[in-house]
Swiss-Prot record:
It comes from the Bacteria. This is Putative competence-damage inducible protein. PANTHER family: NICOTINAMIDE-NUCLEOTIDE AMIDOHYDROLASE PNCC, NMN AMIDOHYDROLASE-LIKE PROTEIN YFAY. It comes from Bacillus cereus (strain G9842). The gene is cinA. SUPFAM superfamilies: CinA-like, Molybdenum cofactor biosynthesis proteins. Gene3D superfamilies: 3.30.70.2860, CinA-like, MoaB/Mog-like domain. NCBIfam families: cinA_nterm, molyb_syn, PncC_domain, PRK00549.1. Belongs to the CinA family.
Amino acid sequence: MNAEIIAVGTELLLGQIANTNAQFLSEKLASIGINVYYHTVVGDNNKRLQKAIEAAEERADILIFTGGLGPTKDDLTKETIAASLDEALVYDEKALALISNYFKRTGREFTENNKKQALVLNGATVFANDHGMAPGMGVNKNGKVYILLPGPPKEMKPMYVSYVEPFLRNFTTGENIYSRVLRFFGIGESQLEVKVQDLIDGQTNPTIAPLANDGEVTLRLTAKHQNVSEAEKLIQHVEDLILERVGEFFYGYDQEFLHYKAIELLKRKGLTLACAESLTGGLFGNQVTENAGVSSVFKGGVICYHNDVKQHVLRVPEEVLHTDGAVSKECAHYLAENVKDLLKADIGISFTGVAGPDASEQKEPGTVFVGLAIKGEQTAVFPLNLSGSRQQIRERSTKYGFYHLYKKLEEI
């Protein structure tokens, strides 16, 4: 079955709030085999809402509305749908009692417009609002399913999980949707697509959806099957084919981000880490400490932005700074080795480069060197030539640092 999500509210059109409900609902609907092909946003205007309803009825089996169930005059969703379906609005006694009791408890006047929140479509299945006033509702009429939900996410999300999804399962084929995200780094989206283009072109079940995100590329594999284990087998087969071709760039699944994977591997190896940050100015250390329990492996870091700190704290030779420059392979080498020794860590990592927007030491913005020194191993320096804004260059440099750390840890 196909669904359309219609968000009602002028504040959405004005950009005053983001439509996070649509993202949540699309993901949840996909997981129970309901396709979402359209998101519509319409203001608080009954004529435009009516047109949106008519358009959605032409292309969707399920129409899901969020917003417009409140007590004010511009809350028009129920009234407009009632008129469209030629159904009366009636009071839901449970909702009316809930709202009435709230006003009694707070000592406020229970006005007629507040009673409006308890109105539901005649014959509808009513969804209790456990976190607010206005109930939701579901109606099956003329071969279409109409779902009305409150706009505030704190009300809508728990209502969907507790009441709406079980209701919608009555209209699905029973197919389960299983998804797995493969995460890649060090390869561009276009390069990766070329290597797996035939798999993408031939996709049916599972489907393959590539997505680039600031230096990373993900492939979302999605399979449908009434049996979850069979869906997993379908995905595993395609994953194996993909990793045969681009496995060297693969680092994790789903929400396993680079910094998490690198730190978890560091913990398993029982090794400690220190960082020297010039270009990144603490970004790397900040992401390290986002991981719980990291104090067992992270010794600390030095933000060595000024050359005096590079020379006098981290003992980069003056000759290197004068001859090769602070932005150089040689400087990154010394920074990584010496921060490791200074903080008595097993591994030292360093970042030096030009974030821009102007050149420095006659080197263009995006010129970056990441140093990696590991006790008992030869120190490596990875030169990078990055593009983007100042902040993007710094953030991408940090990601490359985690990537090279992760790959090196896999080897030892």
